[in-house]
Amino acid sequence: MKNQIQVQLSKLKETSNSENAIKKQLEIIETIEYNDYLQLKKLAEIFHYRITKPEYISNCVDGLIYEKLLNSQNSEIIKFTSKLCPKGIVPLKSNKQMDYQDLQILLVQNNLIAADKLTQQKLIKLAGVDEKSRNWLYFTDIKKIPVEDLQTIDQLWNAHSKGKFGFFVQRQIWLALEKNWEQFWYKIGWEINRVPCRYPEEFHWNSTGPKGHLPLCNQLRGVQVLSALFSHKAWDNY
């Protein structure tokens, strides 16, 4: 059985970005117990191999490995992971010197309701909105958000949700539905029987939510903000 697991773990060295390959790799990582030192050690070795490859761009597989190692019950594994990736696996780039370490920590801890609130706060600041005057965005604010920052926020959500969440994932769903908003709300789980979900109790604050479920946007204010977000130049050649 252990040899079989070792063979399965070795498949994680493959750094394919195909949807099917990523799905299988995520399933392998999920089978690893947090208190199994030998499996965690092997996983840590593979993690080092993956992220130190020249010009390698991390994805949600690395995100789940990072979470599994960092949330393990072994101090040696935690120390190794923290030293290897002191700021996580996503480069925290910002055009406005925004600190994303706090968002990264919340996502790794799977504290999604706090991460969602913090995401909205950061978007408001990035758009240059005075929080004392209003704590929401107009569609005209969206273009003020730098490309680099929007991509960083999206990459954090994607990396730490097994590829399920983030603005780009939402955008892909919206485009696949030919920009039909009613179908979009239903698909990502923001409406039940055509009635907007009540915040926060009717939303899913874990990875069991529908694909594209998070981060949230207040659809009661209309579709213009999300439409502007999905049309942002951050997604050009992304």
Curated annotation (Swiss-Prot):
Per UniProt, the keywords (alphabetical) are:
Chloroplast, Plastid
Q: Supply one GO CC term from the record.
A: chloroplast
- Which GO molecular-function terms appear in the entry? tetrapyrrole binding
Q: What Pfam family is a match for this entry? A: GUN4
Q: What is the annotated localization of this protein?
A: Plastid, Chloroplast
Which top-rank group of organisms is this from?
Eukaryota
Q: Which InterPro entries match?
A: GUN4-like (IPR008629), GUN4-like_sf (IPR037215)
Q: Which Gene3D superfamilies match?
A: 1.25.40.620, Gun4-like (1.10.10.1770)
Per the UniProt entry, the disulfide pairs are none
Instruction: State the family it belongs to.
Output: Belongs to the ycf53 family.
| Stated name of the protein | Uncharacterized protein ycf53
Q: Which species is listed as the source? A: Porphyra purpurea (Red seaweed)
Q: What taxonomic classification does the UniProt entry list for its organism?
A: Eukaryota, Rhodophyta, Bangiophyceae, Bangiales, Bangiaceae
